Design a protein with these regions (language model features):
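Conserved phosphate/ATP/ADP-binding segment of small-molecule kinases
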Residues: 146-226
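Conserved N-terminal subdomain of the carbohydrate kinase-like
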Residues: 19, 48-129, 293-304
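Short beta-strands and strand-loop turn motifs
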Residues: 102-104, 127-135, 159-160, 176-181
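Glycine-rich phosphate/adenosyl-contacting loop at the front of the ribokinase-like
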Residues: 1-57
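Hydrophobic anchor at the start of a short beta-strand
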Residues: 2, 52-54, 79, 156, ...
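Short, small-residue-enriched loops and turns at beta-alpha junctions
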Residues: 108-111, 136-140, 164-166, 183-184, ...
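Conserved post-catalytic alpha-helical subdomain immediately downstream of the catalytic base
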Residues: 206-210, 215-217, 232-300
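Short, conserved phosphate/pyrophosphate- and ester-handling motifs at nucleotide-, phospho-/glycolipid
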Residues: 47, 178, 245
Length: 304
């Protein structure tokens, strides 16, 4: 079972505008959608759609927390969140004139007792894999992430900001930075796919068994120590990019859980991410066409 931990989940609202945004005037959206989100929440939803056993935990509070609970229950996602006195944040993505504007809140402060309660949930569930992902709200440090990794005999996956990744002290089975996070974590030149592969391989040696780096339109790189693989992105119309990295990670994790090799896991991750970016919002995509997309993804070995 995969247990996702999201200390800073969010209600996501996505607004589309037919006209460019401009200051000092009211801009009226032509459409709006609302999703339960936060990186770990996204991963739990995607894994569930991919028929991989998953439970979402973390911290929820207020009206947005209630919305996330309701939405997860309605979509069949198992959840075991800890209630907080604060209000879960509401993030906004505005899409106008071909541009995405992402407006995120830092999140409400979380007290030490609530953090300890989340760690207790992880212990009680005894998962095979724990996925800790997303930003950390005020009051939560990477010490909490290390505590989760050290609390039991499970694989721990992290998907966090680059600065946070550098302060982790435990050993992790997988790290999933994007290109900017990989650059912040390593200080390396990541302007090319090959540069990203070298940076991922170097970063792996700091405490990660594998590094899965998402590169946007350049695809994804996986460094395992013995090899480095690159999977190219597919050329499709992009409606939105929010949640693409979570979809990539979920597809790869689901494939590995089914016993797939690394190449198949990369193909699956890219295919799931491709389906997601073809729609607006972070709700799990319809998986029709997944197999056909997976067959189109090319994977090559890079110099490690």
């Amino acid at each position: 079972m995969h247990l996702t931990v999201t200390f800073n989940p969010a209600g996501d609202q996505t607004l589309r505008f037919e006209e460019p945004l401009a200051p000092d005037r009211v801009s009226r959206a032509s459409s709006a959608r609302f999703d339960a989100a936060g990186k770990g929440v996204n991963v739990a939803q995607f894994l569930t759609v991919l028929s991989t056993d998953a439970v979402a935990t973390g911290v929820l509070g207020g009206f947005t927390g209630a919305f996330i609970r309701e939405r997860l229950a309605a979509t069949g996602v198992s959840a075991a969140f800890v209630e907080s006195d604060g209000t879960t944040r509401l993030n906004t993505t505005a899409v106008a004139d071909g541009t995405e504007y992402k407006l995120n809140h830092d999140g409400s402060a979380v007290d030490p007792e609530t953090v300890d309660a989340v760690v207790d949930v992880v212990r009680e569930r005894t998962p095979d894999t724990v996925v800790v992902s997303g930003s950390l709200p005020p009051g939560v440090t990477t010490a909490a992430v290390d505590a989760i990794a050290a609390a039991g005999d499970w694989d721990t996956v992290v998907d966090m900001e680059g600065d946070a990744l550098r302060t982790l002290n435990e050993r992790y089975s997988l790290c999933k930075p994007n290109r900017a996070e990989l650059a912040r974590a390593t200080g390396a030149d990541v302007s090319t796919v090959e540069g990203c592969a070298r940076a991922a391989t170097a970063f792996r040696k700091t405490g990660f068994d594998r590094v899965l780096a998402s590169l946007g339109g350049d695809g994804v790189v996986l460094s395992t120590g013995s090899t480095a693989l690159h999977a190219g992105a597919l050329d499709v119309d992009v409606a939105g990019t929010v949640g693409a990295g979570d979809a990539l990670l979920s597809g790869a994790l689901a494939a590995w859980a089914d016993g797939a090799d690394d190449r198949t896991a990369l193909r699956t991750g890219v295919a799931v991410a491709t389906l997601l970016v073809g729609q607006v919002g972070t709700a799990p995509p319809d998986l029709d066409g997944l197999d056909a997309l997976r067959e189109r993804v090319s994977v090559r070995e890079l110099s490690n």
